[in-house]
Amino acid sequence: MDKFWWHAAWGLCLLPLSLAQQQIDLNITCRYAGVFHVEKNGRYSISRTEAADLCQAFNSTLPTMDQMVMALSKGFETCRYGFIEGHVVIPRIQPNAICAANHTGVYILTSNTSHYDTYCFNASAPLEEDCTSVTDLPNSFEGPVTITIVNRDGTRYSKKGEYRTHQEDIDASNTTDDDVSSGSSSEKSTSGGYVFHTYLPTIHSTADQDDPYFIGSTMATTRSGGKDGRRGGGLPKDATTSLEGYTTHYPETMENGTLTPVTPAKTGVFGETEVTVAEDSNFNVDGSLPGDQDSSMDPRGNSLTVTDGSKLTGHSSGNQDSGANTTSRPGRKPQIPEWLIVLASLLALALILAVCIAVNSRRRCGQKKKLVINSGNGKVEDRKPSELNGEASKSQEMVHLVNKEPSETPDQFMTADETRNLQNVDMKIGV
C-alpha cells in the first residue's frame, strides 16, 4: 500500500512536466519582406537545430543577413535575440537602452548560451509588411503535442502534431532559460556583440563588388566559447587589422599573412580603431583562426573583416610604421583607497581641535588679575557688604610690584642707613 501511494505522489509531481511537454505556444509577428520572429512558450527555449525545424514547419527557412537587412529597411525590429543563418541577432531601428545595448541596425550577439528565439523567412510572403494571421503549420507531422499559433492580433490556432526532428530537442523541451531582454543587467551575453550596418559602403567583398557592408564592433570583451573561424576580404598592402584578439599583418611583399596574438585593453570604455580599406581589392588574405564558424562571414559566403572593439570606416587613425597600425592603450586613472580618505578626514579633524585648544589657552593666559589686600578680619566674602563698602577706601590698596634698577652706590646706601639710625636714636631720647 505504501508503494502505491509513493508511486502516486511521483506521478502527480511528473504530471505538470508531461503536460508542459505536450503543449507548445508559438508567438509570431508580422512578416517584413518575408522575415518574421517566433517565440516559443514565452521564453528563450529554442536551440539552433530546433530553430531550423521550426522554420521548416512554417514552410520557411532561417533568414540570411541580407534578408534581415532587407526586413530592417521595411520597418522590422524586435527586442528579442533570435537565430538566423550563422548568427544570433536583434534588428533595431530605434535605440533603446534595454534592446541591443542601445544600438541600432542588425545587432549580432556573440554568446556561449544555446537557447534563444528564432527568425524565419518565407519566400512567398509579400515584400512589404504583412500582418495576416497564420492559421497552419503546413510542414508539421503527426505527434502528441498540441501546437498553438498565437498571432500578433491575439488570434490563436491550435493543432496536434510535431515539428522537431532531433531527439535532444524533444528531451530538452522542459529546459527553462531566463526570459530577459537584451541590454539589461541579466543579459544572456558573456562576450558582447557588434552591429551590422548597411549605410556606410566601406568594405567590398571580392566576389560581389555591388553590395556594400559595414560591420562596426560595439564591445571589446573577452570571448568565451565564441566562434572565430575564417577571416578574409580585400585589404590593401601594408595594413594591420585586429581580429578578435589577434593581429593580422600584411607585409609590403603581399605574401601570406601572419597572426600575432594581442591582448585587448579592458578599459570599460568603447574605443575605436579605424582601418584603411583601399580601392584595390585584388589582394586577398584568408587566415584560419580557432573555431568552426565566424560571426563576421558575409551571408553569400564571402569573408568580411571584423574588428572587435573597432569600426571599419574607410580611413585610418593611428600610426602606420613598417606595416603595422599601432594604437595606444588609454591610461587608467588611479583610485584613492577608502582607508586613505578616512585617515585624511581624521587628521583634519584633529588639526581643527588642536587649533581650537590653542586659541582658548591663549585667551586664558592673556587675562589681567588684581591683587586685593584686606586688613580686616576674615575673608572678604564672609563680611557684610556695608562693611566692605565703608572700608574699601581705607583698607584696600593696590600693590604694584615695580622692578627698579638701583641707581645709588653701596657707599650711599651705608650713609643713608647711618643717618636713619641716628634719627631713630634721637627720637627715642626725645621720648
UniProtKB/Swiss-Prot annotation:
What protein is this chain from? CD44 antigen
Q: Where is this region: Disordered?
A: 158-191, 219-243, 279-333, 376-396
Give me the ranges of the annotated region Stem: 226-338
Biased composition regions of type Basic and acidic residues, renumbered to the chain: 158-169
Q: Which organism is it from?
A: Mesocricetus auratus
Main localisation: membrane
Membrane topology (Extracellular): 23-338
Q: Where is the signal peptide?
A: 1-22
Q: How is it modified after translation?
A: N-glycosylated.
Location of the region described as Required for interaction with EZR, MSN and RDX and for co-localization to microvilli in the Swiss-Prot/TrEMBL record: 362-380
GO function term, MF aspect, one: cytokine receptor activity
Residue ranges spanning the membrane: these are 339-359
Which ranges make up the Cytoplasmic topological domains here? 360-431
